[in-house]
Amino acid sequence: MKKNTDSEMDQRLGYKFLVPDPKAGVFYRPLHFQYVSYSNFILHRLHEILTVKRPLLSFKNNTERIMIEISNVKVTPPDYSPIIASIKGKSYDALATFTVNIFKEVMTKEGISITKISSYEGKDSHLIKIPLLIGYGNKNPLDTAKYLVPNVIGGVFINKQSVEKVGINLVEKITTWPKFRVVKPNSFTFSFSSVSPPNVLPTRYRHYKISLDISQLEALNISSTKTFITVNIVLLSQYLSRVSLEFIRRSLSYDMPPEVVYLVNAIIDSAKRITESITDFNIDTYINDLVEAEHIKQKSQLTINEFKYEMLHNFLPHMNYTPDQLKGFYMISLLRKFLYCIYHTSRYPDRDSMVCHRILTYGKYFETLAHDELENYIGNIRNDIMNNHKNRGTYAVNIHVLTTPGLNHAFSSLLSGKFKKSDGSYRTHPHYSWMQNISIPRSVGFYPDQVKISKMFSVRKYHPSQYLYFCSSDVPERGPQVGLVSQLSVLSSITNILTSEYLDLEKKICEYIRSYYKDDISYFETGFPITIENALVASLNPNMICDFVTDFRRRKRMGFFGNLEVGITLVRDHMNEIRINIGAGRLVRPFLVVDNGELMMDACPELESRLDDMTFSDIQKEFPHVIEMVDIEQFTFSNVCESVQKFRMMSKDERKQYDLCDFPAEFRDGYVASSLVGINHNSGPRAILGCAQAKQAISCLSSDIRNKIDNGIHLMYPERPIVISKALETSKIAANCFGQHVTIALMSYKGINQEDGIIIKKQFIQRGGLDIVTAKKHQVEIPLENFNNKERDRSNAYSKLESNGLVRLNAFLESGDAIARNISSRTLEDDFARDNQISFDVPEKYTDMYKSRVERVQVELTDKVKVRVLTMKERRPILGDKFTTRTSQKGTVAYVADETELPYDENGITPDVIINSTSIFSRKTISMLIEVILTAAYSAKPYNNKGENRPVCFPSSNETSIDTYMQFAKQCYEHSNPKLSDEELSDKIFCEKILYDPETDKPYASKVFFGPIYYLRLRHLTQDKATVRCRGKKTKLIRQANEGRKRGGGIKFGEMERDCLIAHGAANTITEVLKDSEEDYQDVYVCENCGDIAAQIKGINTCLRCSKLNLSPLLTKIDTTHVSKVFLTQMNARGVKVKLDFERRPPSFYKPLDKVDLKPSFLV
């Protein structure tokens, strides 16, 4: 292909981010942020959370205290690898142990005396078992010396049944921007949350609400349930900041539109009226009176001074160690936003914007659960001490309370899909696609209750804040998850930071801010507030904001702060704020830097020559001003040019308006969308459908398929795609394969391949084309006495079992075969019976339609015998199986044709698959034709000019014209065969061939599009869905067929099916289907007097209603279905009388018989 030029530099820089970067510790880019998140938790954060020393109870004015101390936290990795865990059928867990000491502190004149109450040195191997994240190459964060398995990308947990678990990331409920809401006309609220920094444990949360009603401006209050007083926010700001009301008026009015200034004046005047209405008003006295009233209202046990200190000291926990004056100025900045948002709501980030949210990654899940369960654990110890003191008069703790921290249950629930009593966080990962291991951990979803309160989800729209950071194609197109789960783009990741790094970074930023002249960072009246994680630290001179932000960004890129993912956002538009974000959970991605109208990539001419030998971290160190990591908030409030090409077409003045420039369009797709080809050449819906189908494609075998007793579908003879994108290659999806190359022909074939029908060649199937193997888990639990029952049983279902009661290895199971022995015996109460033992055969049987070979058998002996069997089955394509291309051209096998029935070219080659040609025009999938053309061109010239095999790069989204690809194909054919005529060259480029009719051996009149393409087999298999049943299990209550194919259920024959048969006059068939079955047959006696169903008492049928009236009605026997009787009984139980009545008329088909005179005729 052509040599890289300067215009492709942006693309090459984007590729550098995708490839591994060992110098920065990045070995697998797609899931690196998840590995770091979990590693931070288990190596650092877990120790911080569990290391505790705090009072449990206090007595006698804090002179006596019961203390708890948790120390010696140790985390031990497992001794075995994930493969051994699968073989043993065990989970892959790390063990956490700690020591608990509970003692009593008494303050005396001599000092503090300590008396030991209880202690526990946790050495139990089951104290805390933490599911261990398996990283790339089977590595884990505790033992990095584990061997590398290149095709194992990791990102999963293994639970106790050796089943892989993988989960999505959840959007955190707490927003970083206050939430504005219109309660009713002229009534508004502004609610925000304050969370303590990560170094403050336990984490403190406070939620505040500012309310404003235009008709009652005096009631512009801030409140928080049980944690703060309800007070006018203007007066609170004055109390905290110690400034005048005129100062607050000028601060709120500065750089505001006239309508907002008018409202500000009205609010300040209303606050003045409050002060004037109180004689000798004093702001301290006013606040103290409110605190005292709240103290009485809550009936607090604390003294008034302690209560006031707790309330005001814990006000705004995220500014815990900040002076009250800065808290007051922070409240004024919030009020500015609130008043501006009332008039210009559309300019303020709404609650659905990703700007306002952080993302919970794997490490954050475990951190949150560990924090919550530790508080429960300490609370249980406190309650146990109080109960023992109350009942026995001693301070003691039961050992059971000390040894059950409760974390194991929480972590187990997390892997079962429950995170803090909500669902949607984790799910079992089916092993049919490698892409699921990448796409699910890179997905971002919402809490279920977030969906209910959100305006966005009423229409499920793609929020503008998700642009560039999320893939616009890989979203569910139907079902309940539409718009709720989004896929990160290939350049996007989620930030992680250690507590120590957080504190160091915060300190460095504060030192940098304070290096400015004191007066320039003290413009609290008319300046731009500077916040670090929403905590106000300074207020900058408005004339210096541009220089400050530019210098900060340059220092950040040069590594001055030691963190390249710091976000700095200049919020203008009258809200006037500089926001610096350093916390975890932010979405970040790289952008090209524009400085003073110049693209910095162009200002480094030596970069191009050195780029091939550099990693992404090298570029950041040696050319720091070329690329900047930008979080989603900074991106939203920056001017970003769409592409380098557009930027270079602008004038110099226009260029100066931009801060950043984006990479090419292919980097806006996610990893699943990157597996497609030429999205931009097709119609829009094909991209969404293509992503859904690509995730359903069956991929190659995992490294230890025989050791995992788990369900899975695997491609037996996978092939690496020839036409790929860089993201597909670097993520190892291409190397792990998810399809095969087949030869297709676009044509109609005898009218068989209509719509989505495809024709597939029989010999192609026999040679292993798109052949798969199905691994299936069968698990049963059997009572121990039933399993050990040695009674002889003549059931044919036991023919595949060995003497130990388990199915034989390598046995071929058919439908109805037992998996393990399960014989239940009963003893008859008959002394005269010779053999009073009766055995019942109740095994769980194999129910699949196809035979399977037993690969592994695993048994666990507890109170029950748990038998787990892994079966394997090779499954070739059959009628009804589904296939697709990477352009969403899904097809279903309509006919399996012999080679002799198919058309052939001049070389005798027949197509493997025939696809309906009209599908290209109706679905507008031009890129499918381009893929065939490029794959065929590769076959003509598979090596580059250096003699190296090279795939063809055809990104999912690209700005390359189709003519460029045609020119590439032309060069390949000219190089391999320079003597081709123009017509022959054109036919080869466009893959047009003359095919011959197999019946007449004459050529078709028109040329046929004929060439190779990468074809995918989907997990939708006919034998997994087909249901065939004549007789079988029925439910006990209504005696109708079970529901569900797995339980041997039948297809429902309902009212519509009945009506169809009625239309054809098939009365006997209806009777047979609906009633004539020995299980469903029911004789019922009906009272002709009242219509009740008769009851059977001591063998005699009696109408209860009539017998109480001393009536002797006629009982008529009717033939009905059992479910009808159940329905009538249930209706009667609900107080509804259904009367069965009989028609009083002669038979329809007979007339009364003529009278016959039996007198002898001779007597007449």
Curated annotation (Swiss-Prot):
GO cellular component: DNA-directed RNA polymerase complex; virion component
InterPro entries: DNA-dir_RNA_pol_su2, DNA-dir_RNAP_su2_dom, DNA-dir_RNAP_su2_hyb_sf, RNA_pol_132_poxvirus, RNA_pol_bsu_CS, RNA_pol_Rpb2_3, RNA_pol_Rpb2_5, RNA_pol_Rpb2_7
Entry keyword Metal-binding: yes
Subcellular location: Virion
Biological process, per Gene Ontology: DNA-templated transcription
Similarity section: Belongs to the RNA polymerase beta chain family.
Protein name from the UniProt record: DNA-directed RNA polymerase 133 kDa polypeptide
UniProt organism field: Vaccinia virus (strain Tian Tan)
Phylogenetic classification of the source organism: Viruses, Varidnaviria, Bamfordvirae, Nucleocytoviricota, Pokkesviricetes
Gene: RPO132
